[in-house]
Design a protein with these regions (language model features):
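Solvent-exposed segments in extracellular or luminal domains encompassing
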Residues: 26-40, 113-127
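Proline-enriched interdomain boundary motifs that mark the N-terminal boundary
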Residues: 65-73, 155-163
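Low-complexity "stalk/linker" and mucin-like segments enriched in Ser/Thr/Pro/Ala/Gly
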Residues: 9-26, 100-113
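Solvent-exposed loop segments of extracellular immunoglobulin-like
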Residues: 5-14, 92-101, 182-187
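C-terminal edge beta-strand
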Residues: 53-62, 141-152
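A short beta-strand segment in extracellular, disulfide-stabilized domains
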Residues: 1-5, 81-92, 171-183
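Short, solvent-exposed loop/turn segments at the edges of extracellular beta-sandwich modules
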Residues: 45-51, 133-140
Length: 187
């Protein structure tokens, strides 16, 4: 060996989480017993007189038993209400769920809270998507779900069924003439 080279020594250490390092001095060792969540390890190269070099690696283990994204039931509101709570199914740590507005309007208070408040909804359909990131543990089609919050216009005209009618037999048919509802009411 060249006396000018300092071969140094390497050592793996567990910083956080769990894990059994099979050969702590091997740069390419196996690790067993990792816990769900983040597990952080440090690789230290000690070159004695030439100093110490360190780097960390994070290994995140996701829970494969996590359920697919579920944004909750569609909602119907009547103006002037412009606020509601979204009701997605929560996720198991370290998975992350995120709300996004995809059409309509609404301001999401906390995008990562499954039961967040949404304000500034407008009349009509407002669609939100709940996206779950759980590493590669969920199939692509199970990572998102949408919910519709439909706000009806309270300022609708009163129902008007039209004029009363009187008929004489044999005429036993006529037409009903009610007024129209304004969008987005049903009538």
């Amino acid at each position: 060996a060249d006396p000018a080279e300092d071969p140094g020594t390497g050592l793996w250490t567990l910083i956080s989480g769990t894990g059994n390092i099979i050969d702590p001095t091997s740069p390419t060792t196996a690790i067993e017993g990792l816990s769900i969540g983040e597990n952080v390890f440090q690789w230290t190269l000690d070159y004695s007189t030439c100093g110490v070099q360190q780097d960390i690696v994070s290994i995140v283990v996701y829970d494969s038993s996590s359920l697919p994204a579920n944004a909750g039931a569609d909602q119907e509101l009547c103006s002037p209400t412009e606020t509601t709570l979204l009701d997605a199914q929560g996720v198991n740590t370290p998975a992350i769920g995120t709300w996004t507005l995809i059409s309509g309007s609404g301001q999401i208070a906390d995008a990562n809270n499954p039961n967040t408040e949404v304000t500034n909804l407008t009349i009509g359909e407002n669609i939100f998507v709940w996206t779950v990131y759980n590493g590669e543990c969920l199939a692509v089609e199970d990572r998102t779900d949408t919910v519709s919050v439909f706000v009806f216009n309270e300022l609708q005209p009163a129902a008007d069924a039209g004029l009363d009618q009187e008929l004489c037999t044999p005429n036993q048919s006529t037409s009903l003439e009610g007024n129209n509802a304004l969008f987005p009411a049903i009538g």
